[in-house]
Amino acid sequence: MREIVHIQAGQCGNQIGAKFWEVISDEHGIDPSGTYCGDSDLQLERVDVFYNEATGGRYVPRAILMDLEPGTMDSVRAGPFGQLFRPDNFVFGQTGAGNNWAKGHYTEGAELIDAVLDVVRKEAEGCDCLQGFQITHSLGGGTGSGMGTLLISKIREEYPDRIMETFSVFPSPKVSDTVVEPYNATLSVHQLVENADEVQVIDNEALYDICFRTLKLTTPTYGDLNHLVSAAMSGVTCSLRFPGQLNSDLRKLAVNLIPFPRLHFFMIGFAPLTSRGSQQYRALTVPELTQQMFDAKNMMCASDPRHGRYLTACAMFRGRMSTKEVDEQMLNVQNKNSSYFVEWIPHNTKSSVCDIPPKGLKMAVTFVGNSTAIQEMFKRVSDQFTAMFRRKAFLHWYTGEGMDEMEFTEAESNMNDLVSEYQQYQDATAEEEGEFEEEEGDVEA
């Protein structure tokens, strides 16, 4: 079947990854020891998308965990699903990357990369028909960003025709964990533009906002944030894992969402999100889901889709519902808010319907959108990058690992090119290329 190899890099990647495996195992009825204890044949029918079956009917995740320091991995191993993973698939160094992209990409990471690639090959060889790779990592630190992008480019060399999908946590606008985040993120984006097929952009601040505003949690933990991300991640692959009326997979997603090869940075969202207290006051219907899914407050990255236009969008519905209703709702959204969709791609939304909803819900939907508003994110990081780079602040940490200033300049201009490409397509009209119209004001949905 269509297998996916999952890789998690660095602290953030491993924490999201650990949560993701909890969610997926729950959906497939697999307990922390790897034994199946579910109640439906459908759970096992395509369990091999994410799991290998070992002797004695034990299911082992097709996951590779890597980090440059053992700390996070030890906590994953000690966590609720720690015994699920194959011990050989933990690959870690001892030194740490110290939030330094150059350490992750050129020095420390480069020493460990061969060990990781061996495990990747082993997992890929165990697949009948490998669909692609999914990587969870952050772009602000050293390992996930530096070593993560190194691994992506190595895998790209070896498996050029397989889909490479990443879930990348971008630096947040107001909350900063590390001073050198803008450097690490810009250098990473420089790599992701060239080597990844689809990048789902996530950021912590937007996730915190969802937890405060929508879920009404007073003190959200990283566990809560990661749970949100995992719900969306599981939705992206649900059509591969469960039967449905309208299927989608990573390649279909890419074909339908990427009009131009460089513009593959997506916003993701998930619905329904309700606080514990207000659940009984809402009915779950397709219109309700569609409404919430296109809501700006629902996006998992801090860009407001109302500030740009959707080039394309994709909705993956889960649960028992009529496809006719889904199509009507999607058409409805496009007709009512036509100014938010570029008019030179007619019918630019794709939908898929999968019969099995997530645990504990009757219906749900995962939203993936390619909006030009994502440029806000890049612009923000780029401005911070320029401010520091102009003074050459912190640069010695990178040049000391053998990097060249030229690389920074290249990464910066690549990021700025990306921003202007998004802007160009936001302004483009259907009638005449090169003739830019004035943009209308903000319209509420």
Curated annotation (Swiss-Prot):
It comes from Plasmodium falciparum (isolate 3D7). GO terms for cellular component: cytoplasm; microtubule. Dimer of alpha and beta chains. A typical microtubule is a hollow water-filled tube with an outer diameter of 25 nm and an inner diameter of 15 nM. Alpha-beta heterodimers associate head-to-tail to form protofilaments running lengthwise along the microtubule wall with the beta-tubulin subunit facing the microtubule plus end conferring a structural polarity. Microtubules usually have 13 protofilaments but different protofilament numbers can be found in some organisms and specialized cells. Interacts with DCX/apicortin; the interaction stabilizes microtubule assembly. Keywords: Cytoplasm, Cytoskeleton, GTP-binding, Magnesium, Metal-binding, Microtubule, Nucleotide-binding. Mg(2+) binds at E69. This is Tubulin beta chain. Tubulin is the major constituent of microtubules, a cylinder consisting of laterally associated linear protofilaments composed of alpha- and beta-tubulin heterodimers. Microtubules grow by the addition of GTP-tubulin dimers to the microtubule end, where a stabilizing cap forms. Below the cap, tubulin dimers are in GDP-bound state, owing to GTPase activity of alpha-tubulin. Residues 426-445 are annotated as: Disordered.
